[in-house]
């Protein structure tokens, strides 16, 4: 997903990953709450018993870290404005070789578009 963003807008790869990560993680977390809770506890030092809440807190903690070190946390932070047409193009380009992408959760066209919308603050 980030390759499409950096390809269209000449965004540095790491910045693009940071801009998409929080939206992707929030979208995928409900499908793998234990995995995100493990990340939150082991990497971000979150001490929360409930896995769902812990995963959410871990995502928020990493996004806050990105902000503290001056990294973008959404597409608009990249000084990039996307609309539905751009979202559609990027999402379709993600699926040129397959009908879904991703390892943790296979993402369909609709999934990809939802993540881009959230990351781009497009309602």
Where do the model's predicted regions map?
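Active-site segments that bind and position negatively charged phosphate/pyrophosphate groups
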Residues: 1-61
């Amino acid at each position: 997903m980030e390759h499409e963003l950096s390809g269209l807008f000449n965004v540095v790869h790491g910045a693009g990953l940071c801009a998409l990560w929080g939206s992707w993680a929030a979208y995928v977390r409900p499908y793998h709450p234990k995995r995100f809770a493990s990340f939150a506890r082991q990497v971000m030092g979150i001490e929360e018993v409930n896995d769902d809440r812990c995963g959410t807190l871990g995502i928020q903690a990493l996004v806050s870290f990105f902000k503290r070190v001056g990294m973008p946390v959404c597409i608009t932070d990249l000084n990039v404005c996307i609309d539905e047409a751009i979202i559609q193009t990027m999402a379709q380009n993600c699926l040129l070789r397959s009908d879904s992408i991703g390892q943790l959760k296979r993402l369909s066209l609709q999934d990809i578009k939802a993540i881009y919308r959230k990351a781009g603050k497009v309602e």
